[in-house]
Amino acid sequence: MTLRVLAGEAQGCAVGPEPDWFLRAATPTDALCLSVLAMQVFLDTYATQGIRPAIAREVLASYSQEVFSQALVAHDCRIVVAERSGHLLGFAQLQLTARHELAPAGAQAELLRLYVQEPFTGAQLGTALLARAEQLASEHGAAVLWLTPWVHNHRALAFYARRGYTDHGATLFTFEGESHENRVLAKSLEVSSAA
């Protein structure tokens, strides 16, 4: 399904001219571009001190083309992409059956990733991708959407707070023997009648 989002529509603002990008469901042919986009955004966000072996291995293990190829055929995963002229600008990845003990009770889904290339931040892509992710989660019966952003990703924490997500405590993300604090953010959703 292709969804064209009018500027401002995703935030409930006055509708302006149509942007030159659109949202659509990812397909298996997107795996390569999703992989590279994810690596780029991850490194821009988390490798602020440069690249070291632990980060390099984590990126190659978590964001390979094969990882995305598998996700795109998984029954409990949905990926929505923002595209312009055949180029991916960002994506949202949902795990429809994921649960977290710190998230509010009820049927849950996880926003595993919401990544937008840096040149396109501020262009409402993140807002539109999040709105679509919330809609998909609701359509699949989730009453709660949760995510775990890094505690030092202040821009992401503020982005989600402005969109109604509340902090439910700390969790750890561990790779290569290193643990990094993340926050559990969650938002209650109205379950869609399509569920």
What is each stretch, according to the model?
Residues L147-L157, T174-S179:
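Conserved beta-strand-loop-alpha-helix junction that forms the acyl-donor binding cleft
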Residues Q117-P119, A123, V151-H152:
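Active-site acidic-Proline motif in GNAT/NAT acetyltransferases
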Residues G164:
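Short, structured active-site-proximal loop/turn typified by the sulfatase FGly-forming signature C/S-X-P-X-R
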